[in-house]
């Protein structure tokens, strides 16, 4: 398998449909056109033609589009054949194309990978293609489109350019130490560095919003049996997703629901009631519950308000709180307010949010929804926002750390060489986002998650 091969793949979803598209990219795309169509279509014009088999018989007829490189998606010669969407027809046409020497089936994401390697897209834009396809809400789709059009990349490139200018200034101060002006201590470098840090902080904040839009927030509902966990899942989901009975231990396994709160994706996970297991099935369910808790972004600690007046989680169930990961945020949910007569709403107890509601009637659930949105810092007015992945957040965080370390070196010891190195590392972290600096292993992991025809 060679990256110089001409590749072909179905660009439409598998199965039956009105239209099925095969995409070909590479130097032999011209030969495919002349062999299957009998001619080379006019560039960037739709041409209605028969698609012919090796013996001259017609396999299908449809629209052919010819995009000679480098003015194509991949930067190579690209041919698209748009025929009928029956799987048998598409399979026959694909087999016909593969009889031409030098043609092979594309790897997942290989069209986008070639576009990246031929400088038609940077890495963040290429990832945005997959994110746009996978978008689960209108806001996520709009943000992914902004990323595809270069909004995220432009912000990153602006930071890289600012760091480049700052590095030039610092390197000059190091290379010409005998000048009358001490460039390292005259305040200009510190001011420029502070500007870059402020700009980076703004991008990080937007990237966290973009990551939340893409990844969603994982919220686990946990507590003792019969506290109303499944009722809360149903209330948040707006449907009967879980079986609810008065029998303790009804939920034996993990239940998942994907919902949106004002555009914010939320993965709600209902778990088995935590107690000493009465049988092997329940024991496995409780083990899975703890696995989900340890991976959560937030835990909703469900408390049956009819069993205790306590509001401090450490007082309600100290063993449960002691087992939780140290930095895991907790929201205490006192349920069954319709029975206890407690006042609905939100308050704070020892650094934890406390919400009183009734999962059965739905009273107070809107307060919980708003709390979840606010606890993640989600902004519903993300005009011009962009999507971001975890690797982007990690690169931005690492760049911020290097800038802070560089600032400490500058102010603490006027150590120009150490500052220059921290600036270089920060610039390298940022360049990983757009692919200016990256590894083949990273590229392989990114593009392997794409659709075959992309």
Curated annotation (Swiss-Prot):
Its cofactor is K(+). Keywords: Cytoplasm, GTP-binding, Hydrolase, Magnesium, Metal-binding, Nucleotide-binding, Potassium, tRNA processing. The keyword Glycoprotein does not apply. Mg(2+) binds at residues 230, 251. Binds 1 potassium ion per subunit. Residues 216-377 form the TrmE-type G domain. K(+) binds at residues 226, 245, 247, 250. GO terms for biological process: tRNA methylation; tRNA wobble uridine modification. Its EC number is 3.6.-.-. It is found in: Cytoplasm. Homodimer. Heterotetramer of two MnmE and two MnmG subunits. Exhibits a very high intrinsic GTPase hydrolysis rate. Involved in the addition of a carboxymethylaminomethyl (cmnm) group at the wobble position (U34) of certain tRNAs, forming tRNA-cmnm(5)s(2)U34. This is tRNA modification GTPase MnmE. It comes from Shigella dysenteriae serotype 1 (strain Sd197). The lineage of its organism: Bacteria, Pseudomonadati, Pseudomonadota, Gammaproteobacteria, Enterobacterales.
């Amino acid at each position: 398998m060679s990256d110089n091969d001409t590749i072909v793949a179905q660009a439409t979803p598998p199965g039956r449909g009105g239209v099925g598209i095969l995409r070909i990219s590479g130097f032999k795309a011209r030969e495919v056109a002349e062999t299957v169509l009998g001619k080379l279509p006019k560039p960037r014009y739709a041409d209605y033609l028969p698609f012919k088999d090796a013996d001259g018989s017609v396999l299908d007829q449809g629209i052919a589009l010819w995009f000679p490189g480098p003015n194509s998606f991949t930067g190579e010669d690209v041919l698209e054949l748009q025929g009928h969407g029956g799987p048998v027809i598409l399979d026959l046409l694909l087999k016909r194309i593969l009889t031409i020497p030098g043609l092979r089936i594309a790897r997942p994401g290989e069209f986008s990978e070639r576009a990246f390697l031929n400088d038609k897209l940077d890495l963040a834009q290429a990832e945005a293609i997959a994110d746009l396809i996978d978008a689960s809400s209108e806001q996520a789709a709009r943000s992914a489109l902004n990323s595809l059009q270069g909004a995220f990349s432009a912000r990153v490139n602006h930071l890289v350019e600012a760091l480049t200018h700052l590095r030039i200034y610092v390197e000059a101060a190091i290379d010409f130490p005998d000048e009358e002006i001490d460039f390292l201590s005259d305040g200009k470098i510190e001011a420029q560095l502070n500007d870059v840090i402020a700009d980076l902080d703004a991008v990080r904040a937007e990237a966290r919003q973009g990551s939340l839009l893409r990844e969603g927030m994982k919220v686990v509902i946990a507590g003792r049996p019969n506290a109303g966990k499944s009722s809360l899942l149903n209330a948040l989901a707006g449907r009967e997703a879980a079986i609810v009975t008065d029998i303790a231990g009804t939920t034996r396994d993990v239940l998942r629901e994907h919902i949106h709160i004002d555009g914010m994706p939320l993965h709600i996970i209902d778990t088995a009631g935590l107690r000493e297991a009465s049988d092997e099935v329940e024991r496995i369910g409780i083990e899975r519950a703890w696995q989900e808790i340890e991976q959560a972004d937030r835990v909703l600690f469900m408390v049956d308000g009819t069993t205790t007046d306590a509001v401090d989680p450490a007082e309600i169930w100290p063993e449960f709180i002691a087992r939780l990961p140290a930095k895991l945020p907790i929201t205490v949910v006192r349920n069954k307010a319709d029975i206890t007569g407690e006042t609905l709403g939100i308050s704070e107890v020892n650094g934890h949010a406390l919400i009183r509601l009734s999962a059965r009637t739905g009273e107070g659930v809107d307060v919980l929804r708003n709390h979840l949105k606010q606890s993640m810092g989600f902004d519903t007015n993300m005009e011009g926002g962009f999507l971001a992945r975890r690797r982007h957040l990690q690169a931005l965080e690492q760049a911020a750390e290097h800038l802070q370390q560089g600032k400490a070196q500058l102010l603490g010891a006027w150590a120009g060489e150490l500052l220059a190195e921290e600036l270089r590392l920060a610039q390298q972290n940022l360049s990983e986002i757009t692919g200016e600096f990256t590894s083949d292993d990273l590229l392989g992991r990114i593009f392997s998650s794409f659709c075959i025809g992309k």
